[in-house]
Amino acid sequence: MSRYVFTSESVTEGHPDKICDQVSDAVLDALLAQDPSSRVACETVVNTGLCLITGEVTSNAQVDFIHLVRNVIREIGYSGARAGGFDATSCAVLVALDQQSPDIAQGVNEADDHSGDPLDKVGAGDQGIMFGYACDETPELMPLPISLAHRLARQLAAVRHDGSLSYLLPDGKTQVSVVYENDRPVAIDTILISTQHTSEVEGISDENGIRERITQDLWTHVVEPATADLPLKPNREATRFLVNPTGKFVVGGPQGDAGLTGRKIIVDTYGGYARHGGGAFSGKDPTKVDRSAAYAARFVAKCLVAAGLAQRAEVQLSYAIGVAKPVSILVESFGTGKVTNDELTALVQDHFDLRPGAIIEQFKLRQLPQQRGGRFYQDTAAYGHFGRPDLKLPWEDVTDKASTLLQAEAQQQKQGSSL
């Protein structure tokens, strides 16, 4: 019997890097909402008293970027007396956006393909490799450690926003260690929560007293509600529960650490449980395959698992800049497949159109901000891009395609047995 512990982390929306992801995606939303053909590569930097947005944009949209940035920062919770050295109203906002390089644009606008299919004319915006993953550990077909870490981070933010724990401040991190036996989760070994807080907590000022109070409150108001509907729950006696191990966490957010777009790519995906191609998502329009193809790879992997063709599936895609069709497609089922990896790969090649133009069209990636009232990508920028039933993400809706795959596999097996 194999036994091991696997750990994943998440962060709250007030973490400096996540502030940047949300600002970058808010810029993307604003541009696509007005001009769905906008080309966007927006990077954000924050530190004490400063937010800088930079990158490349080609768009007909007219956006007040400074007003937009301040609204995002304010919504996260950095405003007024509780801003902690980074205030939406008073921080400097610098905008340094250029136009997209014409050399990149020509490859996307007119792919190196001479077929009559218009989708063949939309080339990948860059070279790269992307991975998608799914497994049957949770209802949303995500690995349990990252799913739990996100649940805790969302609940931590929720009790701050609703005032249940009024001493909490925006910055925070969660980490969950899960015990596996024979590759199945059997227990929650450790939960770690680091959360920013006021210098006094409900009249308590000594460090030990503050930590004891926060520990008690977080178990009651965060851990228990976040895990209440799960079959595998933490146990107050058996699960190690660590809170602010350094003792206190008063200075946080951009006052404590600089933040940058794209530095939480493992939090955004599978918590380290699956491989990652290295490309970040936030601030990038759908022609960037770092984003759109990673969404498609997740869709494919989830379809395979939802169809019962594998308990675990990892899909690798690769692209060349200016070329529409993927350079390669590979499926790995880690020995859990109903059929071989080669057969799974063949099913994917036959039933999924993974050209960038087709991915964009299938998921309506350019239209989503307009369809969702001017805001879509910003909400994916915190608490993960996958396994989010709260957001109704199109790449998570696999019911119809999974059924098609199952029928195709059954037909394939029937034909094979008749030979």
Swiss-Prot record:
InterPro entries: ADOMET_SYNTHASE_CS, S-AdoMet_synt_C, S-AdoMet_synt_central, S-AdoMet_synt_N, S-AdoMet_synthetase, S-AdoMet_synthetase_sfam. Its main location: cytoplasm. Its cofactor is Mg(2+); K(+). Its EC number is 2.5.1.6. It catalyses: L-methionine + ATP + H2O = S-adenosyl-L-methionine + phosphate + diphosphate. K(+) binds at E43. Keywords: ATP-binding, Cytoplasm, Magnesium, Metal-binding, Nucleotide-binding, One-carbon metabolism, Potassium, Transferase. GO terms for molecular function: ATP binding; magnesium ion binding; methionine adenosyltransferase activity. One of its GO terms (biological process) is one-carbon metabolic process. Pfam families: S-AdoMet_synt_C, S-AdoMet_synt_M, S-AdoMet_synt_N. ATP binds at H15, D171, G172, K173, K248, F249, D257, R263, K264, A280, K284. It is found in: Cytoplasm. CDD domains: S-AdoMet_synt. GO terms for cellular component: cytoplasm. L-methionine binds at E56, Q100, D257, K288. Mg(2+) binds at D17. Pathway: Amino-acid biosynthesis; S-adenosyl-L-methionine biosynthesis; S-adenosyl-L-methionine from L-methionine: step 1/1. Binds 2 divalent ions per subunit. Binds 1 potassium ion per subunit. Gene3D superfamilies: 3.30.300.10. Residues 100-110 are annotated as: Flexible loop. It comes from the Bacteria. Catalyzes the formation of S-adenosylmethionine (AdoMet) from methionine and ATP. The overall synthetic reaction is composed of two sequential steps, AdoMet formation and the subsequent tripolyphosphate hydrolysis which occurs prior to release of AdoMet from the enzyme. Belongs to the AdoMet synthase family. Homotetramer; dimer of dimers. This is S-adenosylmethionine synthase. The gene is metK.
